[in-house]
Every structure is written in C-alpha cells, then in structure tokens.
Amino acid sequence: QAAVDYLRREITFTQEMGGSYLLVVPGAVGRPKKYDDSELVRSAESLRIVAQEFATHGIRAAIEPIRSAEVSFCHTISDAKAYLEAVGDPAIGHINGDVYHMQSGESHIGEAIVEAGNLLTNLHLADSNRCALGEGSIDLDTIIRALYLIGFNRDGCYVTPEPLGPGGDPYPAMYGRPEPALLDRMVDSTASYFRE
C-alpha cells in the first residue's frame, strides 16, 4: 500500500510541476537479492492499481531497468517490456533507459535502444564510469545512431544527463552530502559533450 500511495502522490506532483512522465523502478533500489519469487507480480499489481491515475493526469509511466547489482529484477530493456506486459494496462507503456545500467545488462546498447523503439521516452546519459560523457569509454556515436533509427527526436522524448560520479555507492545523496558544484559540472559537461 505504501508504494501505491507514493505513486499517487508522485503522479499528482508530476502533473503539478508540468512533467510528462514519471520514472518507475519496479523493484527496491539498493536491494539486489529478491524477497521471494512473487516480487514482479506484486510490483505489476501495484502499478496496475494506479494505471488509470497515470492516464487521467496525462503522465506516462516510464519503467527503468536497473543493473542487477542494485535491484532484484527488471535489468534489461527486454525485462522492462515483459514487465509492461505483466502490468497489462495500456496506460502503462513506456521505458526509461539508462546507458550506465545498460552497460552491464545489455549485450549491445544500440540494439537495446532499437528494441525499446517507440516505448522509450527518456534516456539517462552518463559515461562508463558514471561520470560525465567523455570521461569514460561509452560509445556515444552508437547511442546517437540508435536514437536516430527509432525517431527519438520528437515531442515527448528526452535525453537526460545523469552523471552521478564514480564509486561503488551510486546514491551518495542517500548516505552523505552531495557536492552540488561537482554534480553541476558533470551535468554541464555531459550536455556539452552530447551536443558536440
């Protein structure tokens, strides 16, 4: 029930802020071991409960696959598509990709983007080391070509810089004090590098 209540608040907040999509991670971030074999089913049932609220508020639910070191299920674009099928409601039908997570879950990031196709509504960008683009080894040209192939340059589709910095703990804001100047520099650098 807590997850459903949280989603209801976030749907309303997203609409009030003028947002068009809400990122949804199906599993508990930071818990890579499953509780039991029914996690996906429970998660899909919870999202199905609020599906019509997404539709009523005009907000797209964007499912984000996360690497297996951080969540217990939904690690790839294929997993996200299967999760959307498990939810089984046309109001829940989008994907939020993240190239950092795709590096460990997908065999080829470009092919995964093409597989997501018109379901992809946002793509998080960070380099292979989770720093700004250009500071690691990500193949940005392949990513841009794949986005071009799926016609991503259209209304309702976004590419969002999300460099969080290197390290084993990807969520420093949860456990310590983030460095706003460093995060701002990495986001600015990522946006500039992408535009080049």
Regions found by a protein language model. Name each.
Residues C74, S78-G97, M102-E196:
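Histidine-acidic metal/acid-base catalytic patches
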Residues Q1-H94, S104-E106, A181-R185:
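Active-site acidic/histidine proton-transfer and metal-coordination neighborhood
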